[in-house]
């Protein structure tokens, strides 16, 4: 995560933070490089609207960064997704549980003024569907954050679902309709 006031980056999930510190202290940066490469792929797949690749990469990150004891935990998934989008720090400001429209956006990646990338509105679901997440984003008018931030660029609505029985992730990505903006 990035604290705009202090201009510092931090990792909010304790398990991930400890693993990051261990990796850096031991000089073993191969895992860190792999995490950044996965993050680059994930961000690019999201922007390309490659739903299958996004679901696959999130599943990979979830398996690699969550202990079996906490695998079926919503907060663990949220932390994994935040960490998986690590590469976003170069082009985005991240917001969590941001009030917008008639509800709260789980995760918003708002591009910096220098970035030409689209805004990413991410809704997480548990034992539902990516389609249901997208429907919620539309019905709750999450795209209204654009008014608050005076953002006029493209917006991608991203719905990520995790099924606890199958341990599978699914993803739906849709451009917000221009007439809504």
Where do the language-model regions lie?
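Extended alpha-helical interface modules used as scaffolds for assembling large macromolecular complexes
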Residues: 1-135, 139-141, 167-181
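A structural micro-motif
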Residues: 92, 153-155
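Hydrophobic/aromatic beta-strand patches that form the interior of the parallel beta-sheet core
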Residues: 120-122, 156-160
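Arginine/glycine-rich "motif VI" loop of SF2 helicases in the C-terminal RecA-like domain
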Residues: 143-152
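Short, conserved secondary-structure transition motifs
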Residues: 160-168
